[in-house]
Amino acid sequence: MSLDVYIKYKQPKKRLIKRGFDGAACGSTIAMYEKDTEVEETEWHANITHNMNEMAMHVPTYYIIDGEVYDSDLYMILWRPEEIGIGNICNNTDVVAQGILHGMTYMMEHRNELLQYNPDNGWGSYDAFLPWLMDYWKACVENPGCEIQTWR
C-alpha cells in the first residue's frame, strides 16, 4: 500500500521520451517506444509506502493560510491535507511546499531521533523518505498554485 500524490498541472507539459522503455518510478507501468516520441503530461505523480507514516507523525511542521500559521506534523500535510483545511481551503502546491520544507529541515536536524521509526519490515526508510520529500517539494515549487490530490 502506498500514498499516491498527484500535482495537476495548469497547462500540459511536453516531454520527449527517447526510444526504448519509459515507466513510472515504481515500475508498475512501462511502455516501449520504437522511436523518440513527444508526449503531453497533465500531472506529476509520486508514491511512497504507507510504512513511512509513523515517521511522518513524529516530524513537526507548520503551514500558513491567509497569513495564519497552523502547527501540524508531516503526516497530516502529506497523508490527510483535507482534514487540516489544506484540501478544503487551498490544497495547492504553495501551502504544501511550506509544510514539506519545514518538515525536511526538522528531519535533517533530527536524523538520529527519527531512525527509530524506520519500518521493521524494511519497506521504506529515512534514507528513502527524505529524497522523496525533496522531489515532492521541488515539484511543488516548480508548479506554483497547482492543485494536489492524494490517494491513500
Regions found by a protein language model. Give the residues of each.
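Acidic (Asp/Glu-rich) sequence patches and key acidic residues
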Residues: 1-152
